[in-house]
Design a protein with these regions (language model features):
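Substrate-binding pocket helix/loop in short-chain dehydrogenase/reductase
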Residues: 96-97, 104-109
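A short, exposed helix-loop element centered on a Lys and neighboring polar residues
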Residues: 120-121, 165
Length: 242
């Protein structure tokens, strides 16, 4: 594959949605600059993308630290122009209200909302001088509904959605596409399968969301013509109740 002429930064490049997004954009010719809390866990992603002929580098990143996020996205832009930035940090916790400590509430907010603000702002700093780019935020069911035991997580995801809305209204006229993707169902991960019974053979097909299928939507969003941009969409399996 030829040397990429654009970079996608994936903040929260974990083993499922983040990794799948990285692989999809690498297959499309982008250099992937991947960040996650423990950079040692990125080796498998590097190897898989390289084996497919793509380009991927990255490092450890604390997305709650302003200077770290700014440096990370500047580094991404120095590899090749930063064209896409994906914020994919979760922070999902489920605690009864009276068991939710100040520390937990603050940490979840820092991870799922404040880090998204930092990411969006610093990505915009790199994109606005060129007058183009895409900034995508991964949301959840909790972005729209505060469930029982999800006071910390839902408040942070509500906040992230508001940050994304505000950014979209400000940056859209400057040719930067901001979108918020509501992942409104269980993603096919080992943790989710364990909660639903453990044995994959016992689960009906296509009732959990395949990260590869989700990643395809990020790819399609980036290639939307700007006369018909999507700000928000929700994704769920065909049989999901909603």
């Amino acid at each position: 594959m030829e040397k990429p002429n654009a970079t996608v930064a994936v903040i929260g490049a974990g083993d499922y949605i983040g990794g799948a997004v990285a692989k999809r954009f690498a297959a499309g010719g982008f250099h992937v600059y991947a960040g996650r809390r423990n950079g040692d866990h990125l080796k498998g992603l590097y190897d898989e993308i390289a084996a497919a002929g793509g380009h991927c580098t990255g490092r450890s990143l604390d997305a709650r630290k302003e200077e770290d996020v700014a440096a990370f996205l500047k580094e991404a832009d120095e590899i090749a122009p930063l064209e896409v930035c994906v914020f994919n940090i979760g922070g999902n916790v489920n605690n009864p209200l009276l068991d939710t400590t100040e520390r937990v509430f603050r940490k979840v907010w820092e991870m799922a909302c404040y880090a998204g603000f930092l990411t969006g702002r610093e990505a915009a700093r790199q994109m606005l001088p060129r007058g183009k780019g895409s900034i995508f935020f991964t949301g959840a069911t909790a972005s729209l509904r505060g469930g029982n035991g999800y006071a910390a997580f839902a408040s942070a995801k509500f906040g992230l959605r508001a940050v994304a809305q505000s950014m979209a209204r400000e940056l859209g006229p400057k040719n930067v596409h901001v979108a918020h993707l509501v992942i409104d169902a269980g993603v096919d991960t080992a943790w989710v399968r364990e909660r639903r019974g453990g044995d994959a053979a016992n689960l009906p097909p296509d009732t959990l969301m395949n990260p590869t299928s989700i990643a395809e939507t990020y790819w399609q969003l980036h290639h939307q013509p700007r006369d018909a941009w999507t700000f928000e969409l929700d994704l769920r399996p065909f049989g999901e109740t909603w």
